[in-house]
Amino acid sequence: MKNKLLFMMLTILGAPGIAAAAGYDLANSEYNFAVNELSKSSFNQAAIIGQAGTNNSAQLRQGGSKLLAVVAQEGSSNRAKIDQTGDYNLAYIDQAGSANDASISQGAYGNTAMIIQKGSGNKANITQYGTQKTAIVVQRQSQMAIRVTQR
């Protein structure tokens, strides 16, 4: 019941500026690419990108407060980038296999950033400006690298 209520709240709050991209590119099922920029209605936005296939890539840009950005990728060449400006934002990237790469950039205060990578090329970068910020990075082996900058 609690999960259902949370889902409904996120759906209602994110409705004015929600966008989602998932699955395969219509032109070629082996290349995934998604770019999402939300800049109107500057609060309570939710952007969710989920990809599965081969040459993954995703890019998000949000401006405002109380924003949610989620990118989840599965196999192959992965990449992801999230850029949020404003306060009380949450950015989440989860990648699974292959060349991985990830980046999150947040400005203002009260922001939370999470990157979870599971295998292969790994790299991660979180840059946060402002106060009251949280950064979480979990890498479960392969070549790994990490840079977290909080100012």
UniProtKB/Swiss-Prot annotation:
Extra facts: Cellulose production is abolished in E.coli K12 / MG1655 and W3110 due to a premature stop codon in bcsQ.
Disruption-associated phenotype: When disrupted in a cellulose-synthesizing strain (with a functional bcsQ gene), cellulose is made but colony morphology indicates no curli are made.
Native source species: Escherichia coli (strain K12)
Role according to the record: Curlin is the structural subunit of the curli fimbriae. Curli are coiled surface structures that assemble preferentially at growth temperatures below 37 degrees Celsius. Curli can bind to fibronectin. The minor subunit is the nucleation component of curlin monomers. Coexpression of cellulose and thin aggregative fimbriae (curli fimbrae or fibers) leads to a hydrophobic network with tightly packed cells embedded in a highly inert matrix that confers cohesion, elasticity and tissue-like properties to colonies.
GO molecular function: identical protein binding
GO CC term, one of those recorded: cell outer membrane
Biological-process GO terms, alphabetical: amyloid fibril formation; cell adhesion; curli assembly; regulation of amyloid fibril formation; single-species biofilm formation
Subcellular location(s) of the protein: Fimbrium
Keywords for this protein: Fimbrium, Signal
Protein name per the record: Minor curlin subunit
Residues annotated as signal peptide: 1-21
Keyword Zinc: no
